Regions:
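Adenine nucleotide phosphate-binding catalytic loops in nucleotide-utilizing enzymes
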Residues: 98-102, 132, 137-193
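Heptad-repeat coiled-coil segments of the DHp/HisKA dimerization-phosphoacceptor module
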Residues: 123-124, 174
Length: 193
């Protein structure tokens, strides 16, 4: 691998987010992405074998359902950039609470280097969960957290959403300005991804 690895986790939206990120990166870089949703310890290990010296970027989906699984996944992947899509109730039976789910999924930051970034959903109470359950002391480097979503308190946010026969449109905002976007898929949940 000659380039960087991005890790993607969350309760929902991992596969769609991985596909969207990879679709953008593939236009410019030789990119490897997780096949379908092979995001378990075995699936991630298989994906890591796909990386070679020609790979410029990798987008690896990392799913967990039990405590300690993310520790093993980040040991394999060592992402330099991470995305935390959402914190829901998937696997709450094994993890006990949304706080514990966030704490376990938040371990994705463990190997972020100095200058690495965690992109986290800033919608609803997810931002508060990330701020309280993903401490920066968990990471080997000094990373930053950037929030995205449909709320204006996010660094990257979408508004003016509407659906039509062509898909879901919205206006994307960041520090450099705004841009009208049309997704070929429907649903505000896809805008959040």
């Amino acid at each position: 691998l000659s380039g960087r690895i991005s890790g993607i986790t969350g309760s929902v939206g991992k596969t769609t987010t991985k596909e969207m990120i990879a679709a953008v990166l593939e236009t410019k870089y030789r990119t490897v992405k997780t096949y379908k949703n092979l995001n378990s310890q075995i699936g991630v290990a298989l994906m890591m074998f796909e990386l070679d010296e020609d790979t410029e970027l990798a987008v690896i989906e990392m799913g967990i359902s039990m405590p300690g699984e993310m520790d093993r996944l980040v040991e394999m992947v060592k992402p330099e950039c991470a995305v935390l899509t959402n914190i829901g109730v998937s696997h709450i039976g094994n993890l006990g609470s949304r706080e514990n789910i966030c704490k376990e999924k938040g371990k994705i930051v463990s190997y972020l280097p100095d200058g690495g970034t965690l992109f986290a959903s800033g919608n609803g109470d997810v931002r508060q969960l990330v701020e309280t359950q993903v401490p920066s002391t968990r990471c080997k480097g000094n990373y930053k957290v950037s929030y995205y979503g449909t709320e204006s308190g996010c660094e990257y946010f979408a508004d003016e959403m509407s659906a039509n026969e062509d898909g879901q449109s919205f206006v994307y905002h960041d520090s450099e300005g705004k841009e009208k976007v049309l997704l070929s898929v429907m649903g505000i949940h896809n805008v959040n991804n």
